[in-house]
Amino acid sequence: MSKETLILLYGGRSAEREVSVLSAESVMRAINYDKFFVKTYFITQVGQFIKTQEFDEMPSSDEKLMTNQTVDLDKMVRPSDIYDDNAIVFPVLHGPMGEDGSIQGFLEVLRMPYVGTNILSSSVAMDKITTKQVLATVGVPQVAYQTYFEGDDLEHAIKLSLETLSFPIFVKPANMGSSVGISKATDESSLRSAIDLALKYDSRILIEQGVTAREIEVGILGNNDVKTTFPGEVVKDVDFYDYDAKYIDNKITMDIPAKVDEATMEAMRQYASKAFKAIGACGLSRCDFFLTKDGQIFLNELNTMPGFTQWSMYPLLWENMGLTYSDLIEKLVMLAKEMFEKRESHLI
């Protein structure tokens, strides 16, 4: 049986590029090499495409993918050179220029099947403010928030936030993930500092009510036939689940499945499915919820390309459902081909 070619795109221009490398290295070790031949392309911090390793069998344990520190510019190619008539692309890219519709649009121009959500749902989910506006239309509960757009009246935004929200308040760039650029404000001074920090990453800022809550996550998989996992819980050893806590300091553990009652579990799974469909998503996503002590559920975020490291919540959630990491990758490839065939069948 001939092997299918799977192209891993990783790295990228966003602040989440290091997470992308970790995810890609985990994926390349989980792939079933009896079924796939793997090509890898590294996207540098400035957007160059670099042709990197190819794997016909499981790489050795010490094999590392190219990074910005080890990049070989002699292997630079034109972005369109990744085209392969019979390949499926797995864009293991997080954040802007990765899961915001940009790379998805590029791959659709090339007419290549790709793992993950489409252009529209990627771009909607990448913007936290737009996501909130869309999900409000289908009745998915969310915490109170205000917004600030660079160039608008900052003093008015701060005044409105102080009048309608109470400390602690979380300030987030609208278009960033992995907790990059997010900070917690406990007074007006730190609120201003938090907005300044967020503006370094985006011109659209979400100012959100902080809640004392457990962080519960649900995995989503499918195209028309959407499946969800039992929830998993992020158990924190830190006050705020930031980028370093997630990926550097290892200050979190996960409880899978989460210890929640059946009614709460079912409600979260239904909200996750409803949110996924509301943004027109396909392939995969992870829905992140807050669960308060009095049982209130709030959807915090919809992540269309969740972390894929061996310790990431998304693959672990599916493993708990009986789907191994390797089988999950095969399922995602199948869903990618299914969506590609549907796109190609549409008249334009």
Swiss-Prot record:
Family to which this protein belongs: Belongs to the D-alanine--D-alanine ligase family.
Binding site for ATP: 162-217
UniProt function note: Cell wall formation.
Disulfide bridges in this chain: none
Domain ATP-grasp residue range list: 132-334
Catalyzed chemical reaction(s): 2 D-alanine + ATP = D-alanyl-D-alanine + ADP + phosphate + H(+)
Entry EC number(s): 6.3.2.4
Main location as per UniProt: cytoplasm
Protein's gene: ddl
Positions of Mg(2+) 2 binding: 301, 303
Pfam families found in the cross-reference section: Dala_Dala_lig_C, Dala_Dala_lig_N
Swiss-Prot/TrEMBL cofactor(s): Mg(2+); Mn(2+)
Amino acids binding Mg(2+) 1: 288, 301
PROSITE patterns per UniProt: ATP_GRASP (PS50975), DALA_DALA_LIGASE_1 (PS00843), DALA_DALA_LIGASE_2 (PS00844)
Name of the protein described by the UniProt record: D-alanine--D-alanine ligase
Subcellular location: Cytoplasm
A Gene Ontology term for the protein's cellular component: cytosol
Enzyme class: ligase
Pathway: Cell wall biogenesis; peptidoglycan biosynthesis
Native organism: Streptococcus agalactiae serotype V (strain ATCC BAA-611 / 2603 V/R)
Gene Ontology terms for molecular function: ATP binding; D-alanine-D-alanine ligase activity; metal ion binding
Keyword ATP-binding listed: yes
